[in-house]
């Protein structure tokens, strides 16, 4: 598991919403007055209770929804919601939804992963290169010819992510990617995400798992009724006031850090444990 990146000065915003608001049909605003940025190289965990607007936010960032007011920017430039503008956005930002069956529709794994690159009008050679690269990144090269309906749930998840990776996005947004996976499947997926990050992809993960967020992310964004609060993960997830408003509990690692410091076993300047292995190492 990679170490959280240490911020010096704010990384540039790859994609950002400024003053954005959105409501479904005639309903109340789901999000309003929203300022939110995905910064290059920062692993970002998006957390909040059901109905807090996480899915809406992800779809706004990826161009699936258009804010009623406000602006979506890509590299500092406003996104145009025409074919050219959305193609530019979707080659930079890719969203993978929670249920892989909502994204898989081709007969085989290889065909499904090739769909996006083919739609870009790339040559057959370039499509094959991208598909092979994406399958290898998700460790499913051996499944290229397998019918998608014969895949396990974990394999379907990986295939859906591979389809996004084949677009070579700079930002990959994942909605509950570890949901429904067994512990081994979760570990394998997290290792894959570490590999994508090492290759230069900025990853955003929506999750309800505060312990996973503490372990994996550099920054955490909490959706509360008052808006989105974003900051370095350990400090943000230690804010019991924010956690309460976001409908979340204190991560065990944060609780353990507080206990260790209270007993003089961990210096205030030292980083607290994010995993059971890190806690065990402190005890040695």
UniProtKB/Swiss-Prot annotation:
Record membrane topology: Peripheral membrane protein
GO molecular function ontology, one term from the record: ATP binding
GO cellular component terms listed in the entry, alphabetical order: ATP-binding cassette (ABC) transporter complex
Domain of life: Bacteria
Keyword Iron: no
Tagged with keyword Oxidoreductase: no
Binding annotation for ATP: 48-55
Entry keywords, A to Z: ATP-binding, Cell membrane, Membrane, Nucleotide-binding, Translocase, Transport
Top-level class of the enzyme under EC nomenclature: translocase
Pfam families named in the record: ABC_tran
Gene Ontology terms: biological process: cobalt ion transport
Domain ABC transporter: 15-250
Annotated SMART domains: AAA (SM00382)
EC number: 7.-.-.-
Subcellular location: Cell membrane
Function: Probably part of an ABC transporter complex. Responsible for energy coupling to the transport system.
Family of this protein: Belongs to the ABC transporter superfamily.
Protein name: Putative ABC transporter ATP-binding protein SCO5958
Annotated organism of origin: Streptomyces coelicolor (strain ATCC BAA-471 / A3(2) / M145)
């Amino acid at each position: 598991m990679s170490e959280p990146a240490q911020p010096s000065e704010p990384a540039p915003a790859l994609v950002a919403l400024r003053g954005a608001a959105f409501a479904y049909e005639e309903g109340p605003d789901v999000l309003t007055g929203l300022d939110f940025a995905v910064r290059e190289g920062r692993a970002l965990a998006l957390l909040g209770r059901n109905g807090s607007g996480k899915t809406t936010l992800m779809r706004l960032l990826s161009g699936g929804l258009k804010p009623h007011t406000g602006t979506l920017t890509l590299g500092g430039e406003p996104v145009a919601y025409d074919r050219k503008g959305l193609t530019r956005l979707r080659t930079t930002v890719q969203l993978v939804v929670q249920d892989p069956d909502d994204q898989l529709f081709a007969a085989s794994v290889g065909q499904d992963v090739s769909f996006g690159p083919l739609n870009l009008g790339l040559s057959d050679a370039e499509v094959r290169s991208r598909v092979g690269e994406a399958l290898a990144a998700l460790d499913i090269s051996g499944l290229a010819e397998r019918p998608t309906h014969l895949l396990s749930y974990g394999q379907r998840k990986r295939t859906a992510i591979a389809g996004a990776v084949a677009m070579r996005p700079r930002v990959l947004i994942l909605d509950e990617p570890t949901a429904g996976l067994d512990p081994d499947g979760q570990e394998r997926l997290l290792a894959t995400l570490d590999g994508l990050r090492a290759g230069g992809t900025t990853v955003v993960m929506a999750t309800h798992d505060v312990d996973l967020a503490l372990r994996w992310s550099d920054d955490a964004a909490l959706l509360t009724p008052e808006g989105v609060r974003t900051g370095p993960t350990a400090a943000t997830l230690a804010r019991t006031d924010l956690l309460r408003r976001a409908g979340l509990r204190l991560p065990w690692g944060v609780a353990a850090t507080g206990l260790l410091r209270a007993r003089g076993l961990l210096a205030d300047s030292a980083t607290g444990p994010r995993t059971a292995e890190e806690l065990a190492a402190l005890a040695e």
